[in-house]
Protein backbone atom coordinates (compact mmCIF):
# COMPACT_ATOMS: atom_id res chain seq x y z
CA UNK A 1 0.00 0.00 0.00
CA UNK A 2 1.38 3.40 -0.95
CA UNK A 3 1.39 6.21 1.59
CA UNK A 4 2.58 9.84 1.28
CA UNK A 5 5.60 11.37 3.04
CA UNK A 6 7.22 14.79 2.74
CA UNK A 7 10.86 14.21 1.76
CA UNK A 8 13.55 16.71 2.72
CA UNK A 9 15.32 17.89 -0.44
CA UNK A 10 18.68 19.67 -0.19
CA UNK A 11 20.07 21.07 -3.44
CA UNK A 12 23.52 22.63 -3.62
CA UNK A 13 23.31 25.74 -5.81
CA UNK A 14 26.93 26.84 -5.51
CA UNK A 15 27.45 29.19 -2.61
CA UNK A 16 24.19 28.25 -0.85
CA UNK A 17 21.79 25.34 -0.47
CA UNK A 18 18.11 25.28 -1.36
CA UNK A 19 16.07 23.34 1.18
CA UNK A 20 12.53 22.19 0.40
CA UNK A 21 9.99 19.47 1.08
CA UNK A 22 8.60 17.30 -1.71
CA UNK A 23 5.72 14.83 -1.43
CA UNK A 24 6.54 11.30 -2.48
CA UNK A 25 4.76 7.97 -2.10
CA UNK A 26 6.38 4.92 -0.53
CA UNK A 27 5.26 1.31 -0.68
CA UNK A 28 4.84 0.30 2.97
CA UNK A 29 6.02 -3.26 2.26
CA UNK A 30 9.44 -1.96 1.11
CA UNK A 31 10.34 -0.26 4.43
CA UNK A 32 13.24 -1.84 6.34
CA UNK A 33 13.31 0.66 9.25
CA UNK A 34 12.15 4.07 10.46
CA UNK A 35 14.21 5.98 13.05
CA UNK A 36 14.20 9.50 14.46
CA UNK A 37 16.94 11.55 12.77
CA UNK A 38 18.38 14.45 14.78
CA UNK A 39 21.09 15.11 12.18
CA UNK A 40 18.57 16.90 9.97
CA UNK A 41 17.66 19.35 12.74
CA UNK A 42 21.33 20.15 13.42
CA UNK A 43 21.95 20.73 9.70
CA UNK A 44 18.87 22.95 9.35
CA UNK A 45 19.98 25.03 12.36
CA UNK A 46 23.37 25.63 10.70
CA UNK A 47 21.65 26.57 7.44
CA UNK A 48 19.26 28.91 9.26
CA UNK A 49 16.24 27.18 7.67
CA UNK A 50 12.65 27.79 8.73
CA UNK A 51 12.27 23.99 9.02
CA UNK A 52 14.70 23.81 11.97
CA UNK A 53 11.91 23.39 14.54
CA UNK A 54 10.41 20.32 12.80
CA UNK A 55 11.20 16.69 13.56
CA UNK A 56 12.55 14.35 10.89
CA UNK A 57 12.96 10.59 10.43
CA UNK A 58 15.29 8.40 8.44
CA UNK A 59 13.46 5.78 6.37
CA UNK A 60 15.56 2.89 5.08
CA UNK A 61 14.09 0.92 2.20
CA UNK A 62 14.76 -2.67 1.14
CA UNK A 63 17.03 -3.11 -1.89
CA UNK A 64 17.69 0.64 -2.25
CA UNK A 65 20.94 2.30 -1.21
CA UNK A 66 19.37 5.77 -0.90
CA UNK A 67 17.75 6.60 2.47
CA UNK A 68 14.86 9.04 2.78
CA UNK A 69 14.81 11.91 5.28
CA UNK A 70 11.10 12.52 5.90
CA UNK A 71 9.18 15.18 7.80
CA UNK A 72 7.76 13.83 11.07
CA UNK A 73 8.91 11.67 13.95
CA UNK A 74 9.37 7.93 13.52
CA UNK A 75 6.22 7.38 15.59
CA UNK A 76 4.17 9.71 13.35
CA UNK A 77 5.34 7.98 10.19
CA UNK A 78 4.81 4.51 11.66
CA UNK A 79 1.25 5.51 12.62
CA UNK A 80 0.62 6.68 9.05
CA UNK A 81 1.94 3.38 7.66
CA UNK A 82 -0.29 1.35 10.00
CA UNK A 83 -3.30 3.50 9.17
CA UNK A 84 -2.80 2.96 5.44
CA UNK A 85 -2.19 -0.78 5.85
CA UNK A 86 -5.31 -1.45 7.92
CA UNK A 87 -7.80 0.92 6.32
CA UNK A 88 -9.56 0.49 3.02
CA UNK A 89 -8.81 3.34 0.63
CA UNK A 90 -9.72 4.20 -2.91
CA UNK A 91 -6.79 4.31 -5.28
CA UNK A 92 -7.24 8.03 -5.96
CA UNK A 93 -7.35 9.09 -2.24
Where are these regions (language model features)?
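Acidic, Ser/Thr- and proline-rich intrinsically disordered linker/docking segments
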Residues: 3-4, 9-12, 16-25, 30-93
Amino acid sequence: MLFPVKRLIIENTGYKRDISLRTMYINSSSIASITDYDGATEFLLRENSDLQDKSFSLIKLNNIADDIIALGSAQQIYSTVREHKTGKHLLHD
